[in-house]
Amino acid sequence: MEAHKPVLFDEVMEGLAIRPDGIYVDGTFGRGGHSFGILQRLGPNGRLMAMDKDPDAVAVENKALFEDARLSIVHETFANLQKAVRDRGWEGKVNGILLDIGVSSPQLEDAKRGFSFSKDGPLDMRMNPKQSMDAASWINQAAMEDIRRVLWNYGEERFAKRIAQAIVNAREEKPITRTQELSDIVIKAYPQREIKKHPATRTFQAIRIFINRELDELRECLPQCLETLAVGGRLCVISFHSLEDRLVKRFIQKESRDHLPREIPILAKDIKHRLKPLGSLIRPTEAEIKKNPRARSARLRIVEKLS
């Protein structure tokens, strides 16, 4: 089959250093592009578990494209990665893990999912539609201060207070149920002099991250990755905005440096760091950005487990 080629594909394949007989986890299956690349590099005894909390990503028709005895596809969030690995008896044996964080292209392109401010659809934004709270439910009942806090904390939106007030004012007239309605509210609330990109970009990002617990799940997943990897195993994390990357960077720093106070008399050679960063932050090439403009904000960090 001809698989979709995802962002930073070549860099991820190189970063995972795939062994033909290795065990790998793709924590964000999506369209299956990274998983397909891993399978191409595995031998007959290699194994891959692909996870995704979006039921559309792990739908039967998608699984049919990946009929392969070496692959198991699991409908589950990567926040439960350790349990899924443990259920297979792989804990401490995994040679590589990939996390490609954030919303996928199919989710953005499907207006019915409600992720995009450029396509009118129901204001949903749930990556897993079985989840109870959607964006419209929250927007129409949250206190103004809670909306402001979400827009600031998860979107770093400078005009969070103005937008939150505009949302509350608008919903007093009628419930906000469509993506276009929310987008129009944000546009009207935004100072014209500040419009350099679409005014709703940060608002939609913030609400999506909040509704899907994206940062919480990433925070829960990273320590699990460390525990499930074998010594010498690799972790590759692709993020698309500073909030995610900052969280990943801090985790790597925490696990790759000395935590002991300087006054404790232990030699540097006796300190056991758990992770080693491999190279610096990787960004897509200009050629890739030209082919796929969405790749522009992608960032890849690669680490290896030492102990």
Swiss-Prot record:
One of its GO terms (biological process) is rRNA base methylation. This is Ribosomal RNA small subunit methyltransferase H. One of its GO terms (cellular component) is cytoplasm. It comes from Coxiella burnetii (strain CbuG_Q212) (Coxiella burnetii (strain Q212)). The keyword Lyase does not apply. Keywords: Cytoplasm, Methyltransferase, rRNA processing, S-adenosyl-L-methionine, Transferase. Gene3D superfamilies: Putative methyltransferase TM0872, insert domain, Vaccinia Virus protein VP39. It comes from the Bacteria. Belongs to the methyltransferase superfamily. RsmH family. It is found in: Cytoplasm. Specifically methylates the N4 position of cytidine in position 1402 (C1402) of 16S rRNA. It is an enzyme of class 2 (transferase). It catalyses: cytidine(1402) in 16S rRNA + S-adenosyl-L-methionine = N(4)-methylcytidine(1402) in 16S rRNA + S-adenosyl-L-homocysteine + H(+). S-adenosyl-L-methionine binds at G32, G33, H34, D52, F78, D100, Q107. SUPFAM superfamilies: Putative methyltransferase TM0872, insert domain, S-adenosyl-L-methionine-dependent methyltransferases. InterPro entries: RsmH (IPR002903), SAM-dep_MeTrfase_MraW_recog (IPR023397), SAM-dependent_MTases_sf (IPR029063). GO terms for molecular function: rRNA (cytosine-N4-)-methyltransferase activity. Its EC number is 2.1.1.199. The keyword Aminoacyl-tRNA synthetase does not apply. NCBIfam families: 16S rRNA (cytosine(1402)-N(4))-methyltransferase RsmH.
